[in-house]
Amino acid sequence: MDLPPRTGSLKWGTYPEDVLPLWVADMDFPPAEAIQQALAERARGFLGYPPREGDRELRELILEALGLEAELAFMPGVVVGLYAAVAAFTAPGQGVLTQVPIYPPFLAAIRDQRRTVLANPLRETPEGYRLDLAGLERLAFATRLLLFCHPHNPTGRVFGEEELAALAQIARRHDLIVVSDELHAPLTYEKPHVPLARFLPERTLTLVGPGKTYNLAGLPIGAVLGPKPLVEAVKRHLPHVFPNVLAMAAWKAALKEGGPWLKATLEQLRANRDRVAAWAKARGLGHHPPEGTYLAWIQTPFPKAAAYFLERARVALNPGESFGRGYDTYVRLNFATYPEVLEEALRRLDGALK
């Protein structure tokens, strides 16, 4: 078990040493050997400015992996793309539609730029979370832009083809542009990920990157894919941006040679997911096992639950209130760690639940 260092790691260095960090979405596993080798080889070579359009082979590999034909532009990361899209397609004071609970930078990209959050809560059913299509229809008239997350962070839902097709119909009826964050797309379990752009190619901007799947968040890079006019609109809000040469080398190695590492990692993540689900069920906590991502969204009996567990269990989790109003009894737990770490964290959480 080779854990990240306490210094130089946001996840492991933010809290005191007696705290187990299961919060920010980093894995504790080292990246694939092929990625490490590609980085070492690139570091011995040219590190100057690359072409603005980036690595051509990498562009083709990304499109092939998603099964899409689209314009593609590199950017410093998916969150940058969210901010740029909000700036490109809305004006201050206007509303931006999204599903809640939602990854906090979605809300920040809207509020930081003086737009209004139009929150459409996911429906919780006995089978898990579902899109509230009726709610989406009611709110769609008030905006031009929908920010979508698929697979969904924090619930781990991988939306099905029927839901995606229905969302596409609503977008067409209401003249919506949809920005779909599909950063976790390869991290699915039983249910495969299907890009929203398969159903709405003319109105979808897809955001992707290697950071979550291959544990490369410290090498920030992403890409926006979609119709050329929409991609060009986003690029106007990414002035003077060049893709990172080391990040491109890592991403290309991941797509070409990272398959065996990803398969083994998904096996461990699936086992961890099932362990957390069994634990939550045995304790009577509200939880639906994620269909994708390595994140567990858990409802507890406690207000300000993350603060409670940090104090009582010395386990750092993401606070539910960061993902939207009304979720302070929830926590997001990152289970992308070694079984020994996860078991110790669950043991500590058990003590706080008694």
UniProtKB/Swiss-Prot annotation:
<dbReference type="GO" id="GO:0047804">
    <property type="term" value="F:cysteine-S-conjugate beta-lyase activity"/>
</dbReference>
<dbReference type="Pfam" id="PF00155">
    <property type="entry name" value="Aminotran_1_2"/>
</dbReference>
<comment type="function">
    <text>Catalyzes the transformation of cystathionine to homocysteine. Can also use cystine or S-methylcysteine as substrate.</text>
</comment>
<protein>
    <recommendedName>
        <fullName>Cystathionine beta-lyase</fullName>
        <ecNumber>4.4.1.13</ecNumber>
    </recommendedName>
</protein>
<dbReference type="InterPro" id="IPR051798">
    <property type="entry name" value="Class-II_PLP-Dep_Aminotrans"/>
</dbReference>
<dbReference type="GO" id="GO:0030170">
    <property type="term" value="F:pyridoxal phosphate binding"/>
</dbReference>
<feature type="modified residue" description="N6-(pyridoxal phosphate)lysine">
    <location>
        <position position="212"/>
    </location>
</feature>
<keyword id="KW-0663">Pyridoxal phosphate</keyword>
<keyword id="KW-0028">Amino-acid biosynthesis</keyword>
<keyword id="KW-0456">Lyase</keyword>
<dbReference type="InterPro" id="IPR015421">
    <property type="entry name" value="PyrdxlP-dep_Trfase_major"/>
</dbReference>
<dbReference type="GO" id="GO:0008652">
    <property type="term" value="P:amino acid biosynthetic process"/>
</dbReference>
<dbReference type="InterPro" id="IPR004839">
    <property type="entry name" value="Aminotransferase_I/II_large"/>
</dbReference>
<dbReference type="InterPro" id="IPR015424">
    <property type="entry name" value="PyrdxlP-dep_Trfase"/>
</dbReference>
<comment type="subunit">
    <text>Interacts with GCBP (TTHA1554).</text>
</comment>
<comment type="similarity">
    <text>Belongs to the class-II pyridoxal-phosphate-dependent aminotransferase family. MalY/PatB cystathionine beta-lyase subfamily.</text>
</comment>
<dbReference type="InterPro" id="IPR015422">
    <property type="entry name" value="PyrdxlP-dep_Trfase_small"/>
</dbReference>
